[in-house]
Amino acid sequence: MQRSPLEKASVLSKLFFSWTRPILIKGYRQRLELSDIYQVPSTDSADHLSEKLEREWDRELASKKNPKLINALRRCFFWRFAFYGILLYLGEVTKAVQPLLLGRIIASYDPDNKQERSIAIYLAIGLCLLFIMRPLLLHPAIFGLHHIGMQIRIAMFSLIYKKTLKLSSRVLDKISIGQLVSLLSNNLNKFDEGLALAHFVWIAPLQVTLLMGLLWDLLQASAFCGLAFLIVLALVQAGLGRMIMKYRDQRAGKINERLVITSEVIENIQSVKAYCWEEAMEKIIENIRQTELKLTRKAAHVRYFNSSAFFFSGFFVVSLSVLPYALIKTIILRKIFTTISFCIVLRMAVTRQFPWAVQTWYDSLGAINKIQDFLQKQEYKTLEYNLTTTEVMMENVTAFWEEGFGELLEKAKENSNDRKISNGDNSLFFSNFSLLGTPVLKDINFKIERGQLLAVAGSTGAGKTSLLMMIMGELEPSEGKIKHSGRISFCSQFSWIMPGTIKENIIFGVSYDEYRYRSVIKACQLEEDISKFAEKDNIVLGEGGVTLSGGQRARISLARAVYKDADLYLLDSPFGYLDVLTEKEIFESCVCKLMANKTRILVTSKMEHLKKADKVLILHEGSCYFYGTFSELQSLRPDFSSKLMGYDSFDQFSPERRNSIITETLRRFSLEGDAAVPWNETKKQSFKQTGEFGEKRKNSILNPINSIRKFSIVQKTPLPMNGIEGESEVPVERRLSLFPDCEQGEAILPRSNMINTGPTLRRQRRQSVLNLMTRSSVNQGQSIHRRTTASTRKMSLAPQANLTEMDIYSRRLSQDSGLEISEEINEEDLKECFFDDVESIPPVTTWNTYLRYITVHKNLIFVLIWCLVIFLAEVAVSLVVLWILRNLSSQDKGNSTQSVNSSYAVIFTSTSAYYIFYIYVGVADTLLALGLFRGLPLVHTLITVSKILHHKMLHSVLQAPMSTLNTLKAGGILNRFSKDIAILDDLLPLTIFDFIQLLLIVIGAVAVVSVLQPYIFLATVPVIAAFIILRAYFLHTSQQLKQLESEGRSPIFTHLLTSLKGLWTLRAFGRQPYFETLFHKALNLHTANWFLYLSTLRWFQMRMEIIFVIFFIAVTFISILTTGEGEGTVGIILTLAMNIMGTLQWAVNSSIEVDSLMRSVSRVFKFIDMPTEESKPPTKSFKPSKDAQLSKVTITENRHVREDDIWPSGGQMTVKDLTAKYIDGGNAILENISFSISPGQRVGLLGRTGSGKSTLLSALLRLVNTEGEIQIDGVSWDSIPLQEWRRAFGVIPQKVFIFSGTFRKNLDPYGQWNDQEIWKVADEVGLRSVIEQFPGKLDFVLVDGGYVLSHGHKQLMCLARSVLRKAKILLLDEPSAHLDPITYQIIRRTLKQAFADCTVILSEHRIEAMLECQRFLVIEDSRLRQFESIQRLLSERSAFRQAIGPPERPGLLPHRLSSRQRSPSRIAALKEETEDEVQDTRL
């Protein structure tokens, strides 16, 4: 970045914003890059501003019992805010005084007032000086207020981010992602956008008082008639605003409903294509869109009337002010024209400035209160550690994730005193009222010495991760003691990758030691993976590691934990995503050898790990089931495998444990009852859900499902929501900001769960921050990286003692025992970390885009032509009236000497000039009112255009090949359907209408002035030309700066979400300061772009003002020097010239806004033009069968099969020379794969993580770019339509897809099967008992990815889909990942029964599942290495043989035979359900 010219700019350069000229020239000539942007001034840096506000906020916290954030802001920014307010007031005063001088100039042409004629030239000079002074006062004031608003936002951003890193996990569990992002985006944007209007809350009343005093002098009491009309108009507009809000709130639910399903489809587009659900998903989304558009049109019509009311209100204001006075007294032209000018200023103050200012203060104070509540929330407390201790010990430790009853009761008592819930937690008491819950850990005791390995095991939800969280201090124990040194390293269950290189992710700020680093790389089996990258370990990883496989991410996370020199290593299931061989090697070389001298706590479920552990701790339902050595475990607890693997029979469950996921669902939502109902007098259970109830995660480490808290009590009436916990104006439906860079109000969307007709749990589902931290899926992110510079700070750590020379942790690069942690980031490299790829859209919207947009709907062209015809009629009538006016004015001038009272003084004389002028005003405004009929069809048609574009874009995305979609980010696609469609629906129609209307007004005004005084036309032409040239010059740079600003906003929120995902890791490594620095750098990058955009915008506005001032000076002196005694002519010219200024500037600004909004249209067109998948039309050889099943095709003419056979009939598959690529022109993931599978054969896929097993399954479905040939039952994939080919397969993907809709829709989106068939299949796969527990059963609506279902239930849903389709070939991609044992056994049983005659291709890490396969396909280095039977693989050197230890090999085949006998006993309990109790399959 370059140094800013502002630092050396002169006073005049700052006043006229001339210092921005270099960037404007560069932006006009070429595309701007980040390196072209000027550096942020030190006074605007995030470090400086955050430190300034943080210091005042700490002072406020220390000095007062009830601290106020607004007091801290006042001490930081008040005096500058007040100074710019005074400048703004002076600028507005000049505007109010201008009509006085105008009236004096008009009066100087009165024949009875020749005395004034001599000073007309001086009055004109004074009027011109006022026009010159106004921009010199106004623009610096507006820029200064925008600048202060920007500084407040930056300081608040930083304060919120720092607070977020300090929040306790308990608080994070209560805050949703949407609330946090909304707090940063929508709330804080109010300071940026609204601070310039804040002063009008006092300026507008003073201005109205001044104007009414001046009008009283002209019209006496009748002036208040116009004011009364304006007040009534303001109230009417407020009422229309309420109607708009009502329609918007109704529509917001539908928008969110559409976006939820669209988001689910985009994130799972590969599954959608694999299931051939493109048409079904398109129909579901379009049905919701239809309802949404009905509400959109209603809201647009009301907004249209609201906008039009302002335009034609001027006539009524002037009429109501002048007519009462004229009925009593005579009125002269000077008073009419002065009144018109006064009323224009008065109308703006009453109907625009004051209401906007009030709304600004309301929104700003609300945002400040929310942020204040957030800043006072409970922080994460580090435990007190003894750095000299060498042991890890727990004594009688009990812990709850939820707050206890005592805390809640005390909080309720405190809050009831002032009838106010502090910290925004007003729903906290009721949402947790009965949720005392089961302790997540209770009476835990263990002790391990230095260098020992403790293996922690237990079924799902037993409390294993909570145990680690308690050691780290994330979970505060309610009882007992914890003892350890505090020097901890942590590896999360769900791998977290920060944007950067592999090397940076592993070192993570610790001083670099080559020997240690290489040892860790080798021990974590990363050498081979790194060697495949051209950049080796300097390869850039995207946010979340999206370019890596799950196993690679897991190994990098483990390497990060191992590299750090700590006393205690907490490893939370680090091998979950690894294949058997890799897991075994890493456990031996890393955990057992490399870390042999370190204290380790490993969460695992593998028997081999337990055997090699020094101590074993088995948890069951939060309690210590066993603690001791493995040999003691075998002798004392022979049934330990049931606790470890979750094989408890139903009858052995405790009463609490018997409650299934459905009972937990009941707990989550509500029992209908009054808030005052005693705990033992709850009413009948109901699934009716209230919005104020605490929203829980679907899949959190806290796992409330396994905490088993059965009941809840909530109020019937919605509780008010304040603070970050909810929006006060929407008590039932939480407002959620999905897209932080969306500037529209509709971006804050209340959640609606009514996706389809049928029962649903009507609760505002949110994803808590804690859930984000514990999600296993990797979100799409930016695939660029960040490097650090050499500037570092030291963090002293206690040195290790008694280590051997071979111990990697004894080595130090530096002389002391400190760790070097980098705090500096280069801004250029930061762009590589987070920035999206720059969109290839021209700086200015092309004419081709406008033409294409206009021709989308044929009616739009006719509407525009009709608007033009009406405008020509307006101009014609106006010109006729003006000619009459001029002729009658000349007649009156001749008769004026014979009249007792001059015709200029009597308003009702039919031949008077001002009466004709009054007729003209009436006719012109009447025609303007006809704009209602002109503009309404335009707005209506533009919304229809938006509907068509949305439909085309949705169809294009669903039909696009995966090779194209793989190059796009899910967030970018979703932005097209959210932000850009919102712009097309809401902003673009009314903005286009405003621009057209303003343009016509300007053209009409210029025509009137030119007819009255042709000389003025000579001044008008160059002024309009100058405006057009200036607009084009500014537009090139401003649009690029706006694009850079938008791109710069993304890293801020990306970094926030990245930090939250890895918050536990950050705290464990003490990396908060570094990430705060990184966040400040991201803020500074955005600030640099935004500040430059504000400055160039002021430059443009100032130049427009200068051009107008020159124009007005020319008009004024031409009128005075060339006009005779035409008082009416001078009044019309000067009045219209003053109006031209504001209207023309408004029109130019509207044209710039239209151009900016049309960029959304360009992006939509770009998506519409995406290529489609190669889907050959059905040939005469293939016809859909009369059977309703889409997975079957009747073969009528094919040499491979007999006539009238159903395809596929056997499932025989032949693959020849298959090569697969994810992206056109990319590297081949698979090369020359050839094999043949017999009908009904089961084939297992073997290979290291990332070897291409999932890619092979995708290639079979033609989801990736493929070369070669595949045949099924003799039919080649080249001779069959793509959709029919995919319907031949049944798929259970690695990433389960459950969209928002009913059970029936999720199982059968096309509605092909009746209920009886669906229930039969549900019974086969073990889903009947689950579905029957929900109200509405098959019509129960699942939302948010089916969060009320366990992962196992979701897998069973996928299995049921394949059974319904009667697929002959089944593809399974790691179906047992994260499955509880019982669901796993159900899937195995179903595969044996329902798919006994089907061909099965299985990618799996569990050895037991692979033993069901007859043959194995081994993939290595993108090629097929082996395709053999299990006996052959065990008899030779292979990866499969290496993964199985010699002692276990003899038992493999007998185990395969006996597994069929044991399975029924483990799943027998599935059918022992009663009406009140259902087995919990999430063990």
Swiss-Prot record:
Residues 423-646, 1213-1446 form the ABC transporter domain. N-glycosylated. Phosphorylated; cAMP treatment promotes phosphorylation and activates the channel. Dephosphorylation decreases the ATPase activity (in vitro). Phosphorylation at PKA sites activates the channel. Phosphorylation at PKC sites enhances the response to phosphorylation by PKA. Phosphorylated by AMPK; this inhibits channel activity. Its main location: membrane. CDD domains: ABC_6TM_CFTR_D1 (cd18594), ABC_6TM_CFTR_D2 (cd18600), ABCC_CFTR1 (cd03291), ABCC_CFTR2 (cd03289). The modification Phosphoserine is found at residues 549, 660, 670, 686, 700, 712, 737, 768, 791, 796, 814, 1459. InterPro entries: AAA+_ATPase, ABC1_TM_dom, ABC1_TM_sf, ABC_transporter-like_ATP-bd, ABC_transporter-like_CS, ABC_transporter_C-like, CFTR/ABCC7, CFTR1_ATP-bd_dom1. ATP 1 binds at residues 401, 434, 458-465, 493. Residues 654-832 are annotated as: Disordered R region. Keywords: ATP-binding, Cell membrane, Chloride, Chloride channel, Endoplasmic reticulum, Endosome, Glycoprotein, Ion channel, Ion transport, Isomerase, Isopeptide bond, Lipoprotein, Membrane, Nucleotide-binding, Nucleus, Palmitate, Phosphoprotein, Repeat, Transmembrane, Transmembrane helix, Transport, Ubl conjugation. The keyword Transferase does not apply. Binds and hydrolyzes ATP via the two cytoplasmic ABC transporter nucleotide-binding domains. The two ATP-binding domains interact with each other, forming a head-to-tail dimer. Normal ATPase activity requires interaction between the two domains. The first ABC transporter nucleotide-binding domain has no ATPase activity by itself. This is Cystic fibrosis transmembrane conductance regulator.
